[in-house]
């Protein structure tokens, strides 16, 4: 259909979208090899990096897609350099590390605490690395974090965003499904999926379901338009604020709904749909049709933009992709197309795409965030691809949209025996 075509899907523009390489693993391998060579030359110097937002998932995904062992070797190399960050009394990692010398610490603005999302968003990658190398140390480090968090897990499943790496206890801080909290909850569900939903990973699902009850307790509805939104919590008070970052939640809820019984599954899926409607309207209620960074909700006024920049974030289109695949409702494709057209109109420039300093005026900034290529465009690509392309039955996406192959139970013989590498199955049009 005409609405799904664009000049950015042909010619030289296709090379800017990593989704282009999903069906071309050899070109992916060549592109990523150049990146790896350049990046590791930089990392060999005194580089201070976050243990969270790195490329281990991208390297493992490239290995799964291409079968080229260079990516597995480099994933192991960089992870070995990161491991000193986990050498804390509690096992909760520091969030910054110098890769050349292995010295780790937390940023000053957290008062020495570790960030929940940073500490709880390596499990997929580290488990996958142990599966593919046969070395259990990576999985052990990641799962020790979850064991520590289980000790302090509250009855509502909602953890504050700051955790003390020495005592392993939660510090008084905000509870949110937005910045610094989000992907911890996402990974509880996805590790359960990665583990083939077996008894061995049942505790991840149980923790996730507990947290979803907590999410329900944070959910309110606006007037007059009945938009559902997820509050933040500070102490005993709820704040009527929702980050666009929290718009990953509808997709997460939809992905996890089928694990419940029929009645609860319907409730969770309906909430996913309602939250997706809200997130779509984050976009539709501004003059540029692009969402602000966060929104505030006031009685009788529905929603209002808080921080008014847009930096090309992927969370809403991510959820639309999940909901389209899991419901078959093409409304989610229509909504995704509207968002893509708004990016084309407001953010497209000759050399790429840029964010907006203000979604009300349309004033542009001068930066294309890397996640626009890695996530936003990839999820849009998948939103308009058959569900067999990177099928949910065979793959699980990490929080940076890198697909990791799910190792079948018959091949997952336990850590210590490397799993065999599969040939990639190409998705076929329906």
Where are these regions (language model features)?
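Glycan-recognition and catalytic cores of secretory/periplasmic carbohydrate-active enzymes
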Residues: 2-430
């Amino acid at each position: 259909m005409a609405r799904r075509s664009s000049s950015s899907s042909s010619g030289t523009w296709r090379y800017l979208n990593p989704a282009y390489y999903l069906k071309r693993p050899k070109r992916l391998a060549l592109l990523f090899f150049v990146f790896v060579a350049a990046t590791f030359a930089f990392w060999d110097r005194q580089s201070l990096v976050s243990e969270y937002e790195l490329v281990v998932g991208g390297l493992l995904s490239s290995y799964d897609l291409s079968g080229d062992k260079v990516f597995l070797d480099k994933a192991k190399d960089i992870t070995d350099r990161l491991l000193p960050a986990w050498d804390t009394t509690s096992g909760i990692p520091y969030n910054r590390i110098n890769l050349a010398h292995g010295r780790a610490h937390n940023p000053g603005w957290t008062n020495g605490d570790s960030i929940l999302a940073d500490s709880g968003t390596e499990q997929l990658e580290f488990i996958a690395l142990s599966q593919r190398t046969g070395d259990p140390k990576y999985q052990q480090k990641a799962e020790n974090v979850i064991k520590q968090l289980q000790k302090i897990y509250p009855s509502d499943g909602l953890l504050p965003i700051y955790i003390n790496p020495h005592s392993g206890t939660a510090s008084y801080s905000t509870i949110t499904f937005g910045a610094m909290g989000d992907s911890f909850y996402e990974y509880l569900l996805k590790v359960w999926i990665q583990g083939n939903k077996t008894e061995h990973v049942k505790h991840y699902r149980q923790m996730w379901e507990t947290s979803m009850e907590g999410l329900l307790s944070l959910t309110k509805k606006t007037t007059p338009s009945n938009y559902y939104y997820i509050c933040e919590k500070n102490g005993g008070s709820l704040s009527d604020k929702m980050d666009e970052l929290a718009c990953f939640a509808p997709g997460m809820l939809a992905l996890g709904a089928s694990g419940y019984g029929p009645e609860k599954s319907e409730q969770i899926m309906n909430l996913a749909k309602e939250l997706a409607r809200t997130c779509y309207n984050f976009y539709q209620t501004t003059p540029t049709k692009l969402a602000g960074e966060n929104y505030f909700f006031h009685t009788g006024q529905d929603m209002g933009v808080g921080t008014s920049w847009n930096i090309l974030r992927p969370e809403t289109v991510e959820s639309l992709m999940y909901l389209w695949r899991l419901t078959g409702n093409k409304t989610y494709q229509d909504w995704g197309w509207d968002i893509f057209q708004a990016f084309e109109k407001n953010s497209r420039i000759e050399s790429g795409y840029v964010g907006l300093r203000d979604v009300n005026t349309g004033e542009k900034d001068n930066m294309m965030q890397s996640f626009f290529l890695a996530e936003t465009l990839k999820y849009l690509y998948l939103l308009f691809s058959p569900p067999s392309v990177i099928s949910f039955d065979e793959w699980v996406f990490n929080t940076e949209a890198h697909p990791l192959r799910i190792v079948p139970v018959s091949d997952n013989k336990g850590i210590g025996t490397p799993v065999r590498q599969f040939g990639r199955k190409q998705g076929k049009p329906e």
